[in-house]
Amino acid sequence: MKVGVPSEVKNHEDRVALTPSGVHELVRAGHQVFVETRAGVGSAILDEDFVAAGATILGTADEVWDTADLVLKVKEPIAEEYHRMRKGQVLFTYLHLAASRPCTDALLESGITSIAYETVQLPDGSLPLLAPMSEVAGRMAPQVGAHHLQSDGGGRGVLMGGVSGVYAAKVVVLGAGVSGMSAAAIALGMQAEVLLVDKNIARLRSADAIYQGHLQTVASNAYEIERAVIDADLVIGAVLVPGAKAPMLVSNQLVSQMKPGSVLVDIAIDQGGCFEDSHPTTHADPTYRVHNSLFYCVANMPGAVPHTSTYALTNVTLPYVLEIANLGWRDALRADPALALGLNTQEGILTCPPVGESLGLPSVTPSEVLN
């Protein structure tokens, strides 16, 4: 199979979808790999590294897309890439379609077969291809929150860990999944006062056991969220419904009651965000104000640490890439139920019901297409 790796074009997105070791494994299995020139530079991977592993370097994104049977990306296609997609081609990347009707429409109109990293789901409900980027974003959230709590970052001038005789920052983490637990761990490491909120009591019990009382936990409901958010210096939104739009947990009216200079970091922005006033921002212009609070809603947070993120991502995606390349997408999905759940579109058909529900579009299950 011909596997193509174009450069990412989203603002400040320096990750790349394949490393030289991945190229080596694909070539060893009998496949051809085509990489756009300089695609790996942001992740400190040079063209020469790809060539040494067996890849062919192409000069433009158009050449890569035209050549490839299987296109590997990190982020969803944006408008300038839509014309490159075609029927008979397979795209394997993060899609987050519940938050993007234009991208969904473009995929359906092109007829491309698209498989989303974030909806590949194991029998235990875990999301193996989303987990590493959730971990990165979760670990970054307290860092960016701490910066923006500083007065030079636009915040109320609070130090996360406080000092002797002065209160530490109050951090509320909404969601105790991979990103939420990662955020809580880093915030605790910064010596903040941390409250973890989730509706899953088993997860909260696990957090209590891990951190032995060093953080507080509370069951999620509207009353407790309101109390926590009003008292918070930093709120980190880390909720997820696989494939679907994130639930809205913090209203505009609630933000109006927050402390002046408080900060909200929405990790869930890829799936539409969990704050009413959230809208996607970029690393170049990451924040905006609502009432007297500062919102940080960068949709590709891990893109700011591309070296770490690229290797963390490709560690988990490569086995699935090899399955698709070795068997062809249809047989690979038939053989692997977890991978089958990643199928989002196929020749103009939406195959992810949670996306259909979020966007009001007709959909079928992956099994209906595969069978």
Language-model segment annotations:
Residues 2, 8, 79-169, 298-300:
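Glycine/serine-rich phosphate-binding loop and adjoining beta1-alpha1 elements at the start
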Residues 6-45, 152-237, 287:
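Glycine-rich phosphate/diphosphate-binding loop of Rossmann-like nucleotide-binding domains
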Residues 118-159, 269, 274-371:
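Adenosine-phosphate binding glycine-rich loop
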Residues 76, 136, 177-178:
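Residue-level detector of alpha-helix initiation sites
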Residues 209-291:
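Rossmann-like adenosine-cofactor binding region
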Residues 2-110:
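An N-terminal-biased, well-structured beta-alpha scaffold segment characteristic
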Residues 69, 75-76, 95-96, 221, ...:
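Short glycine-/small-residue-rich Rossmann-like dinucleotide-binding loops
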